Amino acid sequence: AIKVPLFPLHTWLPDAHVEAPTAASVLLAAVLLKMGAYGFLRLGLPLFPLAAASFAPALSVLAAVGIVYGGLMALIQKDMKSLVAYSSVSHMGLVMLAVFSLNFEATEGAIYQMLNHGLSTGALFLCVGILYERTHTRKIADHGGAAARMPVFAGIFLVVMLSSAGLPGLNGFAGEILCFFGVFAANKALAAVSVTTVILSAAYLLWLYRRVLLGPLKDPGDPRLRDLDKRELAYLVPIIVLIVFMGLFPGVFLRKLDASVSRYLDAVKTPAAATLGLAPAPERGQTAENRAELER
């Protein structure tokens, strides 16, 4: 829960991101945060299914609180890295809420959203690092109008930002919509809370984009604002391609998850069903295509 981080054990994350260099922030967001969620999926829930069933309602509430808290805190940040760090608290809260929903759509969406979050948030930290390399400040108030000097960067930042906000057609949408459907099947009230992540994400990311890249240039004579060089394009363009591909063709990845998610839920929900009063887990080998027919 600390590693995820799950509210209220999240307090280390913003400070860690602010103090870390760009490469460490990317690694932390893209890989290390996922180790906590992986621990729940790989060890915690399968090894202790009855405990998971008993604590799932309470942990789901904490995850839902983290979604709203992380989004609201991101709205008031003055440092770009702190804003992205609190967005991670909100997005990982949605992932954990889906994990604790213990159904097929939510679990598959949680796994896919972990991949999406790693791509989008890692790319956000790369973009913040590029700006910091040029201006040597991460304060949002110290920036403005950078798109006039950095149009290619502004376009890439826009795609990354919209993917993090869950725009349809980009990678964040497919994972989020699966999480929402799964959470709705488990708890309609928490599903309503979870949807706020879309509204809050759009609010703080669009606010960040407007303050940093749009409007008049803060310092028209600043020679440091230059567009992306070949090295920066070499590591950002593949990420953009993957963001778009995962958004347009999520089935390529989700079909690979169907069988393993079904087996996972067999292991977790069979002993947990009596405790939570849940429906039986999907049959082993059940696919997304026949799942709806079996439910009918």
Where would I find each of the regions flagged by the language model?
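Hydrophobic transmembrane alpha-helices and their helix-loop junctions in integral membrane proteins
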Residues: 1-211
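Cytoplasmic/organellar membrane-interface segments at the starts of transmembrane helices
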Residues: 150-152, 205-296
